Amino acid sequence: MVFSKGGFVTVPVVIAAGRRKIPTIIHESDMTPGLANKICIPSATKVCCNFPETVKSLPADKAVLTGTPIRQELLNGSKEAAREFCGFTDDKPVLMVIGGSLGAASVNENIRKILPELLKEFQVIHLCGKGKMDESLKDTKGYVQYEYIKQELADLFALSDIVISRAGANAICELNALKKPNLLIPLSANASRGDQILNARSFERQGFSMVLEEEEITESTLLNVIRELYQNRESYVHAMSESSHMNSIEKITGLIEDCVNKQ
């Protein structure tokens, strides 16, 4: 049995397995398969997909909508631990802003511009990326900023009422599994192959997310969308609760067992 997540090193392995009639499962996280997976699909037994649109574009006997497994430790966060870690109170909702590992300059800049207005309604956790801290905001009440968080991330998610994030496949699947109402700001097509835009629009169509493209960001637009997201948060939680992305691990392991048993 071969299981592949893509990448150029997997291509000869999957092709060789196909020639030897060894069951092979590919997992594609993004809406449009990357080059390695495109090459491997003819040799694969099944293709696990993250989006309904991807399933429709692939051979019907191969494509399966499974979603993407997430880190299980993210499901076990503690609100109380996060509140103590951040020094927050329990009298305002919490907005978490995730700028990505390198930080999203336009997101960081505009969040900080509207921070005085945001702090009237929210407490804000800002994961701003390496080298993107603003020391002038260090002691601002109700606002904490970190370059990067690992150990406490599950706790911060548990405390957060709504989240702003990029639209990488793994990130949005984590938000979906955690049922966190979210605003996605995908990487622009100028800075990527456009997969984040496609990912975000699919989640928007399914009722999981709001989307604001980077070119559309202004102070007033960002503030209004955040308020709208919070006001309608329950509808997003409901949609995510009904999502086919739930139980991804069970779906994929079941598929592996089926393929092995049919040898």
Language model region names:
Residues 1, 146, 158-173, 180-181:
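Acidic donor-binding loop of glycosyltransferase active sites
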Residues 1-20:
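An aromatic- and histidine-rich active-site surface loop
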Residues 18-80, 88:
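Active-site-proximal region of nucleotide-activated glycan assembly enzymes
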Residues 22-23, 161-162, 179-187, 208:
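Structural loop-to-beta junction motif characteristic of Rossmann-like glycosyltransferase folds
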Residues 42-43, 155-159, 177:
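Alpha-helix C-terminal capping/helix-to-coil transition sites in glycosyltransferase folds
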Residues 79-81, 88-165, 197-199, 205, ...:
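Donor-nucleotide binding loops and adjacent catalytic segments primarily
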Residues 234-246:
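A short, well-ordered alpha-helix in the C-terminal region of glycosyltransferases
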Residues 245-263:
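C-terminal alpha-helical cap of glycosyltransferases
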